[in-house]
Structure formats: structure tokens, C-alpha cells
From Swiss-Prot:
Its EC number is 2.7.7.60. InterPro entries: IspD, IspD/TarI, IspD/TarI_cytidylyltransf_bact, ISPD_synthase_CS, Nucleotide-diphossugar_trans. This is 2-C-methyl-D-erythritol 4-phosphate cytidylyltransferase. Keywords: Isoprene biosynthesis, Nucleotidyltransferase, Transferase. Pathway: Isoprenoid biosynthesis; isopentenyl diphosphate biosynthesis via DXP pathway; isopentenyl diphosphate from 1-deoxy-D-xylulose 5-phosphate: step 2/6. Belongs to the IspD/TarI cytidylyltransferase family. IspD subfamily. GO terms for molecular function: 2-C-methyl-D-erythritol 4-phosphate cytidylyltransferase activity. Catalyzes the formation of 4-diphosphocytidyl-2-C-methyl-D-erythritol from CTP and 2-C-methyl-D-erythritol 4-phosphate (MEP). The keyword Coiled coil does not apply. Signal peptide: none annotated. The record marks R15, K22 as: Transition state stabilizer. The gene is ispD.
Amino acid sequence: MNYEAIVLAAGRGKRMNAGMNKQFLELGGEPLIVRTLNVFERDERCTRIVLVVNPAERSRFEQLLARFRIQKVAALTDGGEERQHSVYNGLQALAGEEIVLIHDGARPFVRVHHLHELVNAAVQYGAAIPAVRVKDTIKKANGLFVEQTIDRSSLWAVQTPQAFRLSLIMEAHEAAKQAGYLGTDDASLVERIGKPVKIIEGDYRNIKLTTPEDLLFAEAILASRMAE
């Protein structure tokens, strides 16, 4: 089944300390956002991309889309005050495919086969998210003193893209908007209205580039991909 994608690129990325939006940082000779968009650009099941940007950077994004010949970005939408508001703005710009994938622009390493697994699961269950099992020991703390060691056997680290039936994620966002609720991700809004969210086993290499150290990991992942 086909799908539309919302790609979020409006964040400030302060933790990267790059002096610019991290989406414009180069990774292997291409801007980060271009690498991310190309995953969807090259997937035949993706019919359309909505790119959510800071309005002050709109022209720069438009120049990148033209320079790198990215054809599937059909709309550039302004970001909101919070990530959730940015997603909501992106949802308003969709054309109406039954399934939508919502993705962080700073995750350039998602695999196409994972996109398809997520789409198939969203068709069946309504909502699906990629996640990886937590490897480290997790402790709950009060200040800098341990209160409890958490059983990690049921813990998952959640990634994007997150996939939804459009009608379901619209319902979830509208309910959150009316209640003034801010969730930590889009799936949490679906959970809030009592609907199931299916986990699809993700890939540890599908990292989100957040800090300068992540750029080093990203270069290593890119080198390994090029060697495949």
C-alpha cells in the first residue's frame, strides 16, 4: 500500500552546537535533510512528502530541494511551537492517502524495508512504531542517587518513522489539542485515546543525530553502508 510522509525539520537542534540548523550539516557530502528525504524519494510506495520547516529557513530548504532534484516534496509547512504542533501542521497538508509516516529529519539511516513493514502493520493495527530493545541497565534516580533498578526486559527505545492510519492519527491529535495535552511522540497520543500501537523491531543504526558525537557515529554508519 502507498503512503504519504511527514518529515520534521523545523527544530533548532541546540544540542548539536553547530551554529545552524543541523539539517544543513553535511554527511558524506550531502546535507543531512537531503539524505533523509532521499529514503522516501526513492521508495516507490511513497507518493508525497510534506516537509515541516522553520519559516525563516523556507527559502534555503527550497534551494536544497531544487539543487538535489527532490521531486516528492509537495508542500513545505511551517513548524509550530512544539514538535506536536509541527506534526499537526503537517497533517493539514496531506493529500489523503490512507497511511501516513511521521519521521524525524535527523534520522537519515532508516531502511526502506522497515518503512514497508511499518505501513503493513499500520494497515492491520492502525498504528505502528519502530523500536529497539534497551541494552543498558536503567535506573530510576532521585537527584543523583539511585532509587530503583528498572526491569529492562519490557523496555523499548522508540524511533521514527511512526506509521498510522490517517483517520486515527488525526483523531488522536484533535483529542490532544482539545485537552491541551502534549505527548512525547505521536504514538503516545494514540495510546491516550485507548488504541493499540504495534511495535516493529527497528535497527540500532537508525539513530537521531542530536549531539556532535552523533556525527561521528553517523559517518561510521555511512561508511559501513557504502561498503555493503
